[in-house]
Amino acid sequence: GLAEVTIENGRLLLNGAYVKMRGVNRHDHDDHRGRAVDMERVRRDLELMKLHNINAVRTSHYPNDPRFYEMCDEIGLMVLAETDLETHGFENVGDIARITDDPAWEPAYIDRIERLVLQERNHACVVLWSLGNESGFGRNIRAMYGRCKELDPRPVHYEEDRDAECVDVISTMYSRVSQMNDFGEHPHAKPRILCEYGHAMGNGPGGLAEYQRVIDRWDSIQGQFVWEWCDHGLAATAEDGREYHTYGGDHGDYPNSSSFCIDGLVLPWQEPSPGLAEYKQVLCPVAVFWMDGLLHVRNGRFFTDTSDVVLDLERVVDGVTDSVRLLAPGTLVPGQQTVLPCPVEAAAGALTHLTVHVRSTTATAWAPQGHELGVYQFVVADESGPDA
């Protein structure tokens, strides 16, 4: 395909249309082979993203195999294409920008961005270039930006250009919900993204719905990327033959980061976690609200209508589904809303819910016909009594 990425009046446009990136940060990882990742596994990663309403991926923090970008072109994932630059370790001596602001290192910095752009600039999936990650700011970042723009006109991102001196898209990581709302209330002249947030460690990412409400509220905030896609556990075999997964320190390695890399939306063997299920629901592209016998439906997509969408309605009485019907929302263009009659009779002496499954009626390269985009549930009436 062909893509044109522009910025007009502080808004990022893809082929002339406003868009928000609903993304994740992805590292190459295989629980049996480490960084040696075959393309079948890469394909599975990307299909899982699409199945969970994710439309963008950041190649944190290095270029990927060229076939990765071909797959993103094919299945429709936007890419924040990042070069392999990080000087995070210099924080240990109090100067993260030590070589970033050293002219002796300029050729090496330029070489990094040249290799990325020259290799991937013919891919329509690339929406933003990224100059690297956590390397401070200085003269070599300015030089990288200039060379990047010479090679390709697409917008450039770099989170540690905090004042957006040269980058085209301003970015932060791990900003609080209240900070994001402040950013929206007082927008920068350039579009804004949240390149890392929702650190998916332990019990999972927190506050995703709260973040999404703020991100959806403000047009100047045009994307977010959860940290991160996959747990970096490595498979091992116990004495009894069972497989288990290890992390830092389990192999006698020292120093190590302990479990700090067990922070993904999918488990090491590519099984979705509950956190990914939550993110999918938060990103559901067709929003549904029910009140007083009416379904309010909004098309939150950016490019396609809802002619392929059906609502699968269930009345649930005391936890048991007792009736099912289908309802088509009609052809809503992006951003359009409608109200549909949906009377639901409350069951006497029981707790009655309305469950709405949002499904696609068409098969795609990554999903079968009938794929569920999201599910909503509403309390119709609670007549179960105080002892229920």
For each predicted feature, which ranges?
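Short beta-strand elements
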Residues: 1-2, 16, 363-387
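Beta-strand-rich N-terminal accessory domains
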Residues: 301, 355, 360, 383-388
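Generic structural detector for well-ordered beta-strands
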Residues: 1, 6, 296, 328-331, ...
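Extended interaction regions within the primary functional domain
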Residues: 278, 282, 312, 348, ...
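Extended substrate-binding grooves/exosites of carbohydrate-active enzymes
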Residues: 1-296, 300-307, 312-320
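Intrinsically disordered, low-complexity Pro/Gly/Ser/Thr-rich segments with frequent PxxP/GP/PP motifs
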Residues: 309-311, 316-351, 355-368
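Flexible inter-domain linker/hinge segments
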Residues: 292, 322, 384-387
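Polar low-complexity intrinsically disordered regions
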Residues: 129, 345-348, 384-387
